C-alpha cells in the first residue's frame, strides 16, 4: 500500500481541500498496482451533529487551510494503514475511526478520513476490476446508485426565508446514471 496526500487542491469555492491517493497491489495479478484518488471539498454549512472538517484556523486562506488534515494523513493515518490489506474496506475504515477516537472525527478530521477511505475504495475497485458501486454494495449489487441534485436552497445561509436547507430531486427510474443526470438537468 502506498498513500499520498496533496495539500494544494482547491474546491469549487476556491477553498483548500484534502486530496488523498492510495495505491494497492492486487493479489494474483503479477504484482500489478492500482491507484485511487479522492478529493473531499467542504460544504457551505455544517450541522451540529456532522463530522468535523479539520481546518487550520490560522491566517492562511481565512483560516480554511487544510495543512493539519494533510499532516494527519501523512503522519498518523498512513503509518496506521501500512501493511493492511486495502481490500478489507471495513478494516481500513475501522482503523481510522479507532485512531481518531472521537465521535465527530475532530482529531484527524473527517476530511482526512473520508479522502483516504474513498481513495482506498477506488483503488480496490480497480484492482478487482469491478465498478465502485459494486465494491461498496457487494458483487450482488444490481443497480448503480442514482444522483441526487439540489434544486433550491434555504436555511441559515440562503438569501431567502425558507426554513428547509435543501430541496433535492432524484431521477428514480432512469435507465443509467447519465440519463439520470439529464433528467435532473431538465427539471
Which stretches of residues belong to each language-model region?
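Mobile "lid/hinge" segments at catalytic clefts and subdomain interfaces of large enzymes
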Residues: 142-187
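Conserved phosphate/anionic-ligand binding catalytic regions in large, soluble enzymes, centered on
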Residues: 10, 15-20, 104-125, 146-162
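Short acidic-glycine loop/turn motifs at beta-strand connectors
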Residues: 24-33
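Short, small-residue-biased leader/transition segments that mark boundaries at the very start
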Residues: 3-11
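Glycine/threonine-rich beta-strand-loop-alpha-helix active-site module
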Residues: 125, 130-148
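A short, surface-exposed beta-strand/turn
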Residues: 33-43
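Acidic, glycine-rich active-site loops and adjacent beta-strand->loop/helix elements
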Residues: 9-10, 42-44, 98-102, 138-142, ...
